[in-house]
Amino acid sequence: MEKARISIRQLFVMIIIFELGSSLLITPGSMAGRDAWIAVLLGCAIGLFLFYLYQGIYQCYPNSSPKEYMDDMLGTKLSWLFSFLYILYFAYIAARVLRDFGEMLLTFAYHDTPIIIVNALLMVVSIYAVRKGIEVLARAAELLFGAMYLLGAIGLVLIIVSGTIDPHNLKPVLANGISPVLHSVFTQTMYVPFGEVVLFVMIFPNLNDRKDVKKMGMIAMAISGLIVALTVAINISVLDVDLTLRSQFPLLSTIQTIKVEEFLDRLDVFFMLALIIGGFFKVSLYLYATVVGTSTLFKEKNPSQLAYPMGLGILILSITIATNFSEHLNEGLNVVPLYIHLPFQLLFPLFLFIVAVWKKKRREKSKGEEAKK
């Protein structure tokens, strides 16, 4: 797994699929009401800054794993502690994403099936993919990205043709001022989905060419932000803001409204395929980061074997994380962003970025002085 190589194009596709993932299931920026789409765009702008930090650290240490460059910046003991905390973070978020998609399948397809069965089936596929390595995941992302794009385009056309879009549901814009939007940005959308790209610090070392990481990564994030904002705006324009916020899965509720010429309806099950693809990749990448982080920290010679215990742990956590879906959503919206995402996505990476840039300048200065001698 650690010797695998992926292209910058594959990274581009993986970022888009990862970003869309579970963010299309719910309503990002829900605290902003009918202005949620604005909160998504502003959150994306901050997400671009966060990605700049993440790739900036990598560019300072292009040939090192996160554990190795934290050793250089923090010392062995602190590096070990923070590496371990990030492993727990990746595993925890993987469990939350797995729970999201398990609940979706229970709601729309498998009403009487225990959630542990549904989650277990999803996790088995992710474990298999992670054991095959990041190269296989990247190639699968390239292949399935086209299917997601096609399904999304068909869905947009059908919604327009069905005549269910009412732009008036998006008005008045900023009726309550900018404050609710900014509150939503700094408590929701800057973290999910955009700050979640912190995971890619575990994937950057696998790139075969690092010169276009910043450009391609930011383009991928901008595209993702536009797609998520458009999806939120369509949900609100079709369902109205009240129903959008009450719906557990507003995109699928929007798809259910499609009815063309009395024969084309109930397409939500069909479009669940696109969502499941996104969910599979998101869970798989979080599992991959957990496995790679654990193998690096504990010097495991056969990292792929860790996919089994890590996957089982994430599966169990996804069931025990909340007693019901309402509690799960409440924690995800009100607790996780400020108490979990904030330190792992912003505070600690910002500190590492400052230290990395400072150390890089010191190294360059030292080399310059030696050259003069």
Curated annotation (Swiss-Prot):
Keywords: Cell membrane, Germination, Membrane, Transmembrane, Transmembrane helix, Transport. The keyword Lyase does not apply. The chain crosses the membrane at residues 11-31, 37-57, 78-98, 105-125, 143-163, 185-205, 219-239, 269-289, 306-326, 338-358. It is found in: Cell membrane. One of its GO terms (cellular component) is plasma membrane. GO terms for biological process: spore germination. It holds the Pfam family Spore_permease. The keyword Lipoprotein does not apply. It is a multi-pass membrane protein. Involved in the germination response to the combination of glucose, fructose, L-asparagine, and KCl. Belongs to the amino acid-polyamine-organocation (APC) superfamily. Spore germination protein (SGP) (TC 2.A.3.9) family. This is Spore germination protein KB. It comes from Bacillus subtilis (strain 168).
